[in-house]
UniProtKB/Swiss-Prot annotation:
Annotated HAMAP family: Arg_succ_lyase (MF_00006)
A GO biological process held by the record: arginine biosynthetic process via ornithine
Intracellular or extracellular location(s): Cytoplasm
Family annotation (SUPFAM superfamilies): L-aspartase-like
Family that this chain belongs to: Belongs to the lyase 1 family. Argininosuccinate lyase subfamily.
GO cellular-component term (any): cytosol
Sorted UniProt keywords: Amino-acid biosynthesis, Arginine biosynthesis, Cytoplasm, Lyase
Protein name: Argininosuccinate lyase
Major localization class: cytoplasm
Pathway(s) annotated for this protein in UniProt: Amino-acid biosynthesis; L-arginine biosynthesis; L-arginine from L-ornithine and carbamoyl phosphate: step 3/3
Length: 466
C-alpha cells in the first residue's frame, strides 16, 4: 500500500507504513459483505436524517448526503458501481464513492457513528428481512402440504417405527406431521424476528456518543421496535444471527427428514410416490434411472446449515467484549445458510406440489406385516376385559400362527383363534382391516379421517394470521 493510499484509509492517520499485501487480503470483506449495500445505504440515510434533525449537521449537508447515497444505490443496482478490495468493506466503498460525488461533506455522515454499530444495524436489517422471506417460504410449503394432506385423508399407508411396519395410517395424517414440524419452524422464525427487532445504531464504537443523537428516531425510521438498551452489547451481539442459523438448522433437519421419505418412497422397492421429471435427473450410463436428485440435495443442505451454525458459534465463543475483527467472519456463514435454506424450501415446495401418489401400492403395503396386530390386542382388552399385557401375549401367539401359515391375521379361522382364546368371536374380524383400524383411531391428533380433517382446518385458519 502506498503512502497516498494509506492517507485515503479511514483509519490511516496514526500509521506510518501500510499493511502487508497478505494483511490486505485477509482484511478485505467486500466480496462477501457487498450484499449489505442496500441496508448500509438505508442505515446511512436514517442516520443522516437524524443528524440533521438534531442539528448536528446542516440541513443542506444532509440533502447533499441523501442525494449522493441515492445515486450510489442506483449505480449498484444498475451494475455501474466498481467495488474495491483496497477499501476493505461495503461501508468504506460507499463512503469513498460518496466523497467522490459530493466532496468533503461526505465526511460528516460518520459523525456519532462507528463501523461497529454501522455493520451491526446493517446485518440486523438483512437478517430481519431474510427471516421474513423464509417465513413466507415456509407458509408456501405448509400450504402445499395441506393440499396434499386434504387430497389423501383416506389414502391408507403403513406407519413405521424403526422403519418397520407398525400401524396403518393415512398419507394425509403423515403429511400433517410435517405441517406440525414446519409450523414450529415458522414460529421460531417469527420469534427470532421479534427478539432481534431492536436497533444498535447510535451505540457507536462501544460506549455511545457525546453528540445529542436521537436513537429512537433512527430505530423508528428503520422499522425497529426500539433501540438496544446497552451500547456495549449492541456492538458485541450476534445472537440474532445465531438464532437465525439455529432456527434454520432445525428447519433444514425437518426438510431433510421429508426428503429422505421422498427418496425412499420413490424407489422401486417402495413405489409409493412418483417424483416428477422437473425434480429428477438421469444417469450418464444407466438409461433406466430416474434419480431423486432434488430431494438428495435438500437432504445434503442440512449439513451446510449445521456447519454454518457451528462455525459462527465457534467464532463467537471466546470473544471478550466488545467488537473484535473475528466477527467479520459472521456474514459468510449466515449468507450461505440463508441461501441453502431458501433453495431447499423452494425445491421441497415444488416437489410436494408435483408429487404423484400410488394409492394402490401404499394400501398393499399397509396390509402387510400384521399392521393391525395392535387392533387385535385392543379388541381383546375392550371386548373381553383381558389385561393388555395378556392380550399382547395372545396376539403374539396369533401372529406366530399366521406367520407359520404365511397368511394375514384376518385370514386365520375363528376356530384357530378360539384355540388361543375361547372367548374370541367373529366380531374380531371387523377391526382387522386397514380401513377399520385407521378410522377407529379418533383420539385427538389421531389418524382417523375426522381427526385429520380437524387438523387441516386448524392449520388453514392458523396460517391466515401466521
Amino acid at each position: 500500500m502506498t503512502d497516498e493510499t494509506l492517507k485515503n484509509q479511514m483509519w490511516g492517520g496514526r500509521f506510518i507504513a501500510g499493511p502487508a499485501a497478505v494483511m490486505e487480503e485477509i482484511n478485505a470483506s467486500i466480496d462477501v459483505d457487498q450484499k449489505l449495500y442496500r441496508q448500509d445505504i438505508e442505515g446511512s440515510l436514517s442516520h443522516a436524517a437524524m443528524l440533521a434533525q438534531t442539528k448536528i449537521i446542516l440541513q443542506s449537508d444532509y440533502e447533499k448526503i441523501s442525494h449522493g447515497l441515492k445515486i450510489i444505490l442506483q449505480e449498484i443496482e444498475e451494475g455501474d458501481f466498481v467495488f474495491s478490495r483496497n477499501l476493505e468493506d461495503i461501508h468504506m466503498n460507499i463512503e469513498a464513492r460518496l466523497s467522490a460525488l459530493i466532496g468533503p461533506v461526505a465526511g460528516r455522515l460518520h459523525t456519532a457513528r462507528s463501523r461497529n454499530d454501522q455493520v451491526a444495524v446493517d446485518f440486523r436489517l438483512w437478517v430481519r428481512e431474510t427471516l421474513q422471506k423464509i417465513a413466507q417460504a415456509l407458509k408456501q410449503l405448509i400450504k402445499q402440504l395441506l393440499i396434499l394432506a386434504e387430497q389423501h385423508v383416506k389414502t391408507y399407508m403403513p406407519g413405521f417405527t424403526h422403519l418397520q411396519l407398525a400401524q396403518p395410517v393415512t398419507l394425509g395424517h403423515y403429511m400433517m406431521a410435517y405441517v406440525e414440524m414446519f409450523g414450529r419452524d415458522l414460529s421460531r422464525m417469527r420469534d427470532a424476528s421479534e427478539r432481534m427487532n431492536e436497533s444498535p445504531l447510535g451505540a457507536a464504537a462501544l460506549a455511545g456518543t457525546s453528540f445529542p443523537i436521537d436513537r429512537f428516531m433512527t430505530a423508528q425510521a428503520l422499522g425497529f421496535r426500539e433501540p438496544t438498551r446497552n451500547s456495549i452489547d449492541s456492538v458485541s451481539d450476534r445472537d440474532f444471527a445465531l438464532e437465525f442459523l439455529s432456527a434454520g438448522a432445525l428447519c433444514a433437519m425437518h426438510l431433510s427428514r421429508l426428503a429422505e421419505e421422498i427418496i425412499l418412497w420413490s424407489s422401486e422397492q417402495f413405489r409409493f410416490i412418483y417424483l416428477s421429471d422437473a425434480f429428477s435427473t438421469g444417469s450418464s450410463i444407466m438409461p433406466q434411472k430416474r434419480n431423486p436428485d432434488a430431494a438428495e440435495l435438500v437432504r445434503a443442505k442440512t449439513g451446510r446449515l449445521n456447519g454454518a451454525l457451528m462455525g459462527l458459534l465457534t467464532v463467537m465463543k471466546g470473544l471478550p467484549l466488545a467488537y473484535s475483527k473475528d466477527m467479520q467472519e459472521d456474514k459468510e456463514y449466515v449468507f450461505d445458510g440463508a441461501l441453502s435454506l431458501e433453495l431447499s424450501l423452494a425445491a421441497m415446495t415444488g416437489m410436494i406440489a408435483d408429487l404423484e401418489v400410488n394409492k394402490k401400492a401404499m394400501k398393499q403395503a399397509a396390509d402387510l406385516g400384521y399392521a393391525t396386530a395392535t387392533d387385535f390386542a385392543d379388541w381383546l382388552v375392550r371386548e373381553l376385559g383381558i389385561p393388555f399385557r395378556e392380550a399382547h401375549h395372545m396376539t403374539g401367539q396369533a401372529m406366530a400362527l399366521a406367520e407359520k401359515k404365511q397368511c394375514r391375521l384376518q385370514d386365520l379361522s375363528l376356530d384357530e383363534l378360539q384355540a388361543i382364546c375361547p372367548d374370541i368371536n367373529a366380531t374380531l374380524f371387523d377391526v382387522l382391516t386397514v380401513e377399520k383400524s385407521v378410522e377407529s383411531r379418533k383420539s385427538f391428533g389421531g389418524t382417523a379421517s375426522s381427526e385429520v380433517l380437524r387438523q387441516i382446518a386448524y392449520w388453514k385458519k392458523r396460517l391466515v394470521s401466521a
